[in-house]
Amino acid sequence: MEVTSYPSEKRMNTNINNLLYMNDENKIIIYQVFTRLFGNNNNHCVYNGDIATNGCGKMADFTLKALGEIKKLGTTHIWYTGIIEHATQTDYRRYNISPDHPAVVKGKAGSPYAIKDYYDVDPDLANDVQERMKEFENLVHRTHRTGLKVIIDFVPNHVARQYHSDAQPDGTTELGANDDPSQSFSPYNNFYYIPQAELRAQFDMKDGAAEPYREFPAKATGNNRFDATPNITDWYETVKLNYGVDYQNGGTCHFSPTPDTWIKMLDILLFWASKNIDGFRCDMAEMVPVEFWEWAIPQVKEVYPEILFIAEVYNPSEYRLSLIHI
């Protein structure tokens, strides 16, 4: 095993100990739940089955009794994974939700980290799809009644390839609406483009559909792949959001004026904070420039001072180094 030494190892160990032995009343104990699995009592699931075959848990399954039992474990917060609407192969066109091409959806239910509409709730989780946001608001209320606090995901680095908001609030603009796709990078764009190139993913682009998935011009893939040929091991179902960093030209930063993506993402944070949640678990936080977090978090906390921001530790070495500076 390779042992990494740190220049301030003694200081880092002290900081870790301070975190571990903080006063019990200040400890945060998070119970994570994959929302669509909780409450799904189907014992006869089949491989690659759809929602009709395999079922799906609902927000209503988190009853006061169930939440009370979770609270008894000593939990302070519950992290509801997969709340925000994401790409799926389930057909919700009758609810005016545009369908996703199966070639750019992982599995039938889809990945909860391929966000399709930042302003909506996953319809799979609702008993009444038309009332899905109300059902989420009721879930938050029930959770608070039991003394628990609510954390949801904020996925800032990437979105589903077919991102489209059918719940876009008045006064806001959809991602990519004003982009210039003839430019591979522009600080005014929300996405990165491969101009004059069609997406040519290195796997089946039909996946059982009558026609293959088409994207022109191709967009950069979520795991920082800036070409038109992602493969099956890439985050192929997602596209990278542009926070003003030109990765293909030395990572130069263009943060003045404030990038449009920053403004749109702040709107999204404030929207969900207004739903009375208590925190965000920020997916792939290290893939978003720290300058954005320094700009956005104080503005959210100015309105909601108690709200938590918790970063995903995807690269443990980055986390260890950050402890040196606590």
Where are these regions (language model features)?
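N-terminal amphipathic/basic-hydrophobic helices that include classical n-h-c signal peptides
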Residues: 1-18, 326
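Short, acidic/polar
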Residues: 56-70, 257-273
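Short, well-ordered alpha-helical packing segments
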Residues: 67, 119, 136-144, 152, ...
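A structural signal for short, well-ordered beta-strand segments and their strand-loop junctions
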Residues: 77-80, 150-153, 281-283, 310-311
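Aromatic- and acidic-residue-enriched segments that line the glycan-binding/catalytic groove
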Residues: 86-111, 157-233
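Active-site-proximal helices and loops of the catalytic beta/alpha 8
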Residues: 158, 170-174, 180-202, 264-270, ...
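Glycine-rich phosphate-binding "P-loop"
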Residues: 239-263, 270
